[in-house]
Amino acid sequence: MFLSASMASSSLHVAIFSLIFLFSLAAANEVTVGGKSGDWKIPPSSSYSFTEWAQKARFKVGDFIVFRYESGKDSVLEVTKEAYNSCNTTNPLANYTDGETKVKLDRSGPFYFISGANGHCEKGQKLSLVVISPRHSVISPAPSPVEFEDGPALAPAPISGSVRLGGCYVVLGLVLGLCAWF
């Protein structure tokens, strides 16, 4: 059976769109510190905290965090928890000074950042964030009931990333199969 040129073109477009969609699901996110305002600077008030802002976001392994600041006047230091808590700028794990720093979050667990400018960390220019493990599901299981008669019920197992990715391959297979059919 021969395909007309327009049907073949339509099938190709569907296949390409499907591939783009699948790759977008696996793409890493870039998150700018501070959200839309995007400025790495001393917070405007003592009630604002970069860490509280970060707690509203979900960071996963492979994401990037972007710091925007005036090069030459400020910097970003990646530090240990102890250095973060004491605003100690000596011996950072990493020192960034380019004005638009993009840090890859390459592991799960906590990350700590402080300003390298004198006195800025003490005025609140610091950020701690937690990167979730690839094992964690984006969807949290429902809470268990408070009272039990026969014993506690098990929470449903979280859906792993490999199961979600496997579902994407099924969709891709269906689309490609439909393309071959027409």
Swiss-Prot record:
Organism of origin: Arabidopsis thaliana
Propeptide part(s) removed at maturation, as residue ranges: 161-182
Protein function: May act as a carbohydrate transporter. Required, together with ENODL11, ENODL12, ENODL13, ENODL14 and ENODL15, for male-female communication and pollen tube reception and burst at the synergid cell surface of the female gametophyte.
SUPFAM superfamilies: Cupredoxins (SSF49503)
Top-level taxon of origin: Eukaryota
Localization of this protein: Cell membrane
Family: Belongs to the early nodulin-like (ENODL) family.
Pfam families (UniProt xref): Cu_bind_like
Keyword line: Cell membrane, Disulfide bond, Glycoprotein, GPI-anchor, Lipoprotein, Membrane, Signal
Tissue specificity: Mostly expressed in seedlings and flowers, and, to a lower extent, in roots, stems and seeds, but barely in leaves.
Domain Phytocyanin: 29-133
Name recorded for this polypeptide: Early nodulin-like protein 14
Record text on subunit structure and interactions: Interacts strongly and specifically with the extracellular domain of FERONIA at the synergid cell surface.
GO terms, molecular function: electron transfer activity
Lipidation feature positions (GPI-anchor amidated serine): S160
GO cellular component: plasma membrane; plasmodesma; secretory vesicle; side of membrane; vacuole
Disulfide bonding pattern of the chain: C87-C121
Positions of glycan attachment: N88, N95
Entry-linked InterPro entries: Cupredoxin, ENL_dom, Phytocyanin-like, Phytocyanin_dom
PANTHER family: BLUE COPPER PROTEIN, EARLY NODULIN-LIKE PROTEIN 14
Disruption phenotype: No visible phenotype. Plants lacking ENODL11, ENODL12, ENODL13, ENODL14 and ENODL15 have a reduced seed set due to aborted ovules as a result of pollen tubes failling to rupture and release their sperm cell cargo.
Membrane association type: Lipid-anchor; GPI-anchor
